């Protein structure tokens, strides 16, 4: 592979990564704005973030986590 081809490939990779990093930053800013809007309408952002984490779990893992939490709460009387 010639140095010119290697340089062009490297520049393409770097360019793609930079573009994606900017898109990621834009998306994170948009998500932040959505949470701020939800908060201004009385929603609990911490609870919303917890729900988002739970939605990522598969059904079995979620059931297992719920059962363990219930066991611990019962054990501690809360």
UniProtKB/Swiss-Prot annotation:
Native species: Rickettsia canadensis (strain McKiel)
HAMAP family, A to Z: UPF0335
Family assignment from sequence similarity: Belongs to the UPF0335 family.
Record protein name field: UPF0335 protein A1E_00570
NCBIfam families: PRK13694.1
A Pfam cross-reference name: GapR_DNA-bd
Ranges in coiled-coil conformation: none
Lineage start: Bacteria, Pseudomonadati, Pseudomonadota, Alphaproteobacteria, Rickettsiales
Record-linked InterPro entries: GapR-like (IPR018753), GapR-like_DNA-bd (IPR046367)
């Amino acid at each position: 592979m010639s140095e010119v081809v290697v340089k062009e490939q490297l520049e393409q990779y770097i360019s793609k990564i930079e573009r994606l990093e900017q898109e990621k930053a834009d998306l994170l800013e948009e998500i932040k704005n959505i949470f701020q809007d939800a908060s201004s309408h009385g929603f609990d952002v911490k609870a919303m973030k917890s729900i988002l984490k739970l939605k990522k779990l598969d059904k079995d893992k979620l059931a297992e986590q719920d059962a363990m939490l219930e066991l611990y709460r019962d054990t501690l009387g809360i």
